[in-house]
Amino acid sequence: MKTKELNLESHPETGIKYDVGKLRFDLLPVKPLEAVAAIYTYGADKYADNNWRGGLTWGRVFGASMRHLWAFWRGEDVDSESGLPHLAHAAFGLLTLLEYQETHPELDDRIKDG
């Protein structure tokens, strides 16, 4: 990860904070993250809080994400069931798979060549 070095001379009137090399959460886009949070809220209302943490096979999550991506790619922006953006649904699935790599490797049902 590459970050800019702290330049103390450019802002001598402000306090010093050594944060070189730390994650820059301030760079994340707010509106898309709010859309993803709406998906988590929708899921909590439909199922239960943190239901997704219990684990699903990776293929089911991947399949759902792909359906939302294809719907978007065909020109449909909003999911008719939830009223929320297809891309936010897909992002939820991708974030879930990232989490499952650490928390649910036993549910990895990908077909592995070789």
Model feature map: region roles:
Residues 1-114:
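Intrinsically disordered, low-complexity regulatory regions
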